[in-house]
């Protein structure tokens, strides 16, 4: 236990040294989009033998076991136990909204609608988050940021290219369920910020996964799904569960909860716009699926939208690099004021 704890702390120190502090959120955001986007291939494989809610339950069984084991090995008892009312409510909110409702509605809805329309409906999450933030937190987006979110959403529509038939076909109920999943994650993210739990985000994520896994198992039973055991499925299904459960759940959700705390729900949930891009790239790399001109153009539109939302951060970084070129100051230094960029 001591060796494991020492190794974990050592790894954390190395990670902090290798990535400058101002870039950690950006690196976490990109990594999160890759982990979420690359999970679709494994999920599609697993759903061939497992019903959707049971698959989601197993996913969070694995994720919770991995994260709770890591937390118990690397944190003192005082750090991983909820201590305040806000901690308990934070775990409950994350478990119900971000884990249970999000995944139950998303997995069920995907079974009755096309992947293209599911991507568009789920892409409304960053549009809904500012509405909940205004209602619950009093936060307001600038007109430029709102325009950037709209442009990024348009880029997602270009990438998935939904047809008019998908809007009026039999998948309308499925589209509504996926939209409900987007609303659940948007509302849960904002509620979590309002509650301001004091415990570290990693143990909070672990306990939320445990709560979500139990609730998903209950929904699977209540929905009459066949309770297939993991031992009775094929090797590919087991492998898909491990791939989804560890990197795309344990690691990805830990990153997501960290970003919710650091950059807020509106900016963190913009990852929903990058996921279709990483999913397309994963399909191209692993399955040989082609990248159409529409996908490349849509990616450019999404990048332009992000540029508007993060214009101040990008401008400050450009100024920092300019100063480095002129005066030789390291662009990765975190000390000192934000350098002016008047020219």
Label every model-predicted segment.
Residues 1-31, 64-94, 107, 140-146, ...:
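Membrane-interface interhelical linkers
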Residues 2-3, 132, 141-164, 173, ...:
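Hydrophobic transmembrane alpha-helices of multi-pass small-molecule transport proteins
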Residues 30, 34-38, 42, 70, ...:
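Hydrophobic alpha-helical transmembrane segments of multi-pass membrane transport proteins
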Residues 32-65, 114, 187-212, 230:
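Juxtamembrane helix-loop-helix junctions in multi-pass membrane proteins
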Residues 46, 55, 59, 109, ...:
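Hydrophobic/aromatic residues within transmembrane alpha-helices
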Residues 51-65, 108-127, 170-184, 234-249, ...:
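Structural signature of hydrophobic alpha-helical transmembrane segments
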Residues 58-59, 94, 121-124, 144-147, ...:
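Hydrophobic core positions of alpha-helical segments in small-molecule transporters
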Residues 62-66, 121-133, 211, 215, ...:
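Alpha-helical transmembrane segments of compact multi-pass small-molecule transporters, enriched
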């Amino acid at each position: 236990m001591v060796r494991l704890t020492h190794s974990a702390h050592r790894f954390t120190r190395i990670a902090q040294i290798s990535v400058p502090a101002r870039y950690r959120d950006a690196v976490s955001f990109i990594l999160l989009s890759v982990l979420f986007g690359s999970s679709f291939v494994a999920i599609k494989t697993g759903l061939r033998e497992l019903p959707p809610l049971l698959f989601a339950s197993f996913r969070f069984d694995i994720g919770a076991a991995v994260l709770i084991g890591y937390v118990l090995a690397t944190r003192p008892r005082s750090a991983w136990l909820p201590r305040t009312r806000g901690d308990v409510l934070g775990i409950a909110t994350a478990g119900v909204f971000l884990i249970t409702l999000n995944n139950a509605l998303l997995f069920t809805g995907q079974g009755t609608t096309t992947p293209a329309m599911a991507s568009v409906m789920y892409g409304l999450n960053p549009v809904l988050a500012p509405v909940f933030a205004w209602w619950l937190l009093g936060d307001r987006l600038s007109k430029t940021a709102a325009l950037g979110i709209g442009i990024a959403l348009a880029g997602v529509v270009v990438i998935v290219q939904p047809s008019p038939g998908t809007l009026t076909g039999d998948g309308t109920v499925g589209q509504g369920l996926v939209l409900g999943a987007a609303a659940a994650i948007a509302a849960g993210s904002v509620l979590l910020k309002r509650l301001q739990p004091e415990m570290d985000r990693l143990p909070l994520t672990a306990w939320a996964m445990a709560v979500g896994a139990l609730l998903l198992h209950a929904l699977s039973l209540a929905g009459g799904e066949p309770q297939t055991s993991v031992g009775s499925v094929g090797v590919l299904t087991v492998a898909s569960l491990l791939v989804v459960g560890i990197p795309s759940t344990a690691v990805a959700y830990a990153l997501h909860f960290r970003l919710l705390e650091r950059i807020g729900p509106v900016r963190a949930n913009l990852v929903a716009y990058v996921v279709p891009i990483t999913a397309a790239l994963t399909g191209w790399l692993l399955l040989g699926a082609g990248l159409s001109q529409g996908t490349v153009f849509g990616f450019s539109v999404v990048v332009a939208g992000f540029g508007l939302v993060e214009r101040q951060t990008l401008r400050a970084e450009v100024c920092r690099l300019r100063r480095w070129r002129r005066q030789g100051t390291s662009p990765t230094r975190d000390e000192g004021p934000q350098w002016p960029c008047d020219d």
